[in-house]
From Swiss-Prot:
Organism, as annotated: Arabidopsis thaliana (Mouse-ear cress)
Compositionally biased spans, kind Low complexity: 30-46
Name the record gives this protein: Dormancy-associated protein homolog 4
Biased composition (Polar residues): 47-58, 71-80
Lineage of producing organism: Eukaryota, Viridiplantae, Streptophyta, Embryophyta, Tracheophyta
Keyword list, A-Z: Phosphoprotein
Keyword Isomerase attributed: no
Entry annotated with the keyword Mitochondrion: no
Region (Disordered): 7-86
Pfam family, one: Auxin_repressed
Family designation: Belongs to the DRM1/ARP family.
Length: 123
């Protein structure tokens, strides 16, 4: 029993038991609360999630860029300390356009973030 006394941590488990582990506090709070038996109704909720795999436009993600001419973006809008480069949002913060690249967009030219997002969507 000496080994168990050394491992006992009062900050986690509370005060040590008087004799043996059978004297530990037992919480009866859960046994006093009784719930009614589940009723058989037509309004049942399913607990499943179905993820459909569609035509994910991977290259379309790379074509999004911030609109630099947004009227709300100015140096007078302070950024938060945690995200100093947070973009300012107008009604349409993203505009579709091509990002200049040296070659064809393919899977090897994806950023790490895009690769993680695409792989998470494919699961």
């Amino acid at each position: 029993m000496g080994f168990l006394h050394k491992l006992w941590d009062e900050t986690v488990a509370g005060p040590t038991p008087d004799n043996g582990l059978g004297k530990l506090r037992k919480h009866d709070s859960l046994s006093t609360v009784r719930s009614s038996p589940p009723s058989l109704s037509s309004d049942q909720v399913t607990r499943s999630i179905m993820v459909t795999k569609g035509n994910n436009n991977v290259r379309g993600l790379r074509k999004l860029k911030m609109d630099p001419d947004s009227p709300t973006c100015s140096s007078s809008n302070p950024g938060t300390p945690l995200t100093p480069g947070t973009p300012c949002y107008a009604l349409g913060p993203f505009t579709a356009g091509k990002i200049p690249s040296s070659g064809e967009d393919d899977a090897a030219s994806l950023t790490t973030y895009e690769w993680i997002v695409i792989n998470a969507l494919d699961r």
